[in-house]
């Protein structure tokens, strides 16, 4: 039997770089919220212990794909603790809607969905804490998708505090370029000394993203999309880009602006949600 699982997008409603550690990683403060929009992962169980990704990603080796790595990590962790039923395997396919290098967390969300879904389907019995800890070894954004609640993140993104920001409507636009995260984080002009503030203070301030000035400077496509969106609503970069989003109170307002978008702007409208669609599907 094949089951389908949501793999939602996320937005960084704000993102501030507060420092850089000796190991090169940047410390930050950011606010994650999910969207009711994303990829869909289909899983069909196997009884021969094999993991097969039926929809390979161009340019990514099978064993390097985060979906496969997540499944293999769960197999190893559950087996090491005697919680993996014999023969646990899966055929996995993905209906991909989220762009790579877009700042929407697509790969991290895919990995988290696989961890949560296979843990459930195989009846391994690992806790969300255990799955989140495993997810962190795959990527800094994976734990928030595993835990499934909007969160204020600190450290390098691994210290999560659940929060409930307003669930607004967003027009999310892709400028047509992919921005590898290191391109932004290695830029010498990236702000790295934004003062740390409490979540209470940050929620009262106007939201912004420290990476935006670098993305706009280095990628004229990002600058063009933001310049257009800012004529209609508060807009900013998500993550390290390339996607940007404009914020609206109603779906109709967001759709009206999207209908006026120039032909070169590729976008969609989605609602911000504080409970992940993945976790809603499991209720």
From Swiss-Prot:
Transferase among keywords: yes
Description of how the protein assembles with itself and partners: Homodimer.
Active site: 10, 141
UniProt xrefs under HAMAP family: IspE (MF_00061)
Listed name of the protein: 4-diphosphocytidyl-2-C-methyl-D-erythritol kinase
Binding site for ATP: 99-109
Organism expressing this protein natively: Escherichia coli (strain 55989 / EAEC)
Pathway stated in the Swiss-Prot or TrEMBL entry: Isoprenoid biosynthesis; isopentenyl diphosphate biosynthesis via DXP pathway; isopentenyl diphosphate from 1-deoxy-D-xylulose 5-phosphate: step 3/6
A Pfam family recorded for this sequence: GHMP_kinases_N
Function field: Catalyzes the phosphorylation of the position 2 hydroxy group of 4-diphosphocytidyl-2C-methyl-D-erythritol.
Primary gene name: ispE
Domain of life of the native organism: Bacteria
Family the UniProt entry places it in: Belongs to the GHMP kinase family. IspE subfamily.
EC number: 2.7.1.148
Taxonomic path: Bacteria, Pseudomonadati, Pseudomonadota, Gammaproteobacteria, Enterobacterales
Molecular function via GO: 4-(cytidine 5'-diphospho)-2-C-methyl-D-erythritol kinase activity; ATP binding
Biological process, per Gene Ontology: isopentenyl diphosphate biosynthetic process, methylerythritol 4-phosphate pathway; terpenoid biosynthetic process
Stored Gene3D superfamilies: 3.30.230.10, GHMP kinase, C-terminal domain
Keywords: ATP-binding, Isoprene biosynthesis, Kinase, Nucleotide-binding, Transferase
Reactions it catalyzes: 4-CDP-2-C-methyl-D-erythritol + ATP = 4-CDP-2-C-methyl-D-erythritol 2-phosphate + ADP + H(+)
């Amino acid at each position: 039997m094949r089951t389908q699982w949501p793999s939602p997008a996320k937005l960084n409603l704000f993102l501030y770089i507060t420092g850089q550690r000796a190991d090169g990683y940047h410390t930050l403060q950011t606010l994650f919220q999910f969207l009711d929009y994303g990829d869909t992962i289909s899983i069909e169980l196997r009884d021969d212990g094999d993991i097969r990704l039926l929809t390979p990603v161009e340019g990514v080796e099978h064993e390097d794909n985060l979906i496969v790595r997540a499944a293999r990590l769960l197999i190893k962790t559950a087996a090491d603790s005697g919680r993996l039923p014999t023969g646990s395997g899966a055929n996995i396919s993905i209906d991909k809607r989220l762009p790579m290098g877009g700042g929407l967390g697509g790969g991290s969300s895919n990995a988290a969905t696989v961890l949560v879904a296979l843990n459930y389907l195989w009846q391994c019995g690992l806790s969300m804490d255990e799955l989140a800890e495993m997810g962190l070894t795959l990527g800094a954004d994976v734990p928030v998708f595993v835990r499934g609640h909007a969160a204020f993140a600190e450290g390098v993104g691994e210290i999560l505090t659940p929060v409930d920001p307003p669930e607004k409507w967003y027009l999310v636009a892709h400028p047509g370029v992919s921005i590898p995260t290191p391109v932004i984080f290695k830029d010498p002009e990236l702000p790295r000394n934004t003062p740390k503030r409490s979540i209470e203070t940050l929620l009262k301030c106007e939201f912004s993203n420290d990476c935006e000035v670098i993305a706009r400077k280095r990628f004229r496509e990002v600058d063009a999309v933001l310049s257009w969106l800012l004529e209609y609503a508060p807009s900013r970069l998500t993550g390290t880009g390339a996607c940007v989003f404009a914020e609206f109170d109603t779906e109709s307002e967001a759709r009206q602006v999207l209908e006026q978008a120039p032909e070169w702007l590729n976008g969609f409208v989605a609602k911000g949600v504080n409970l992940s669609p993945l976790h809603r599907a499991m209720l």
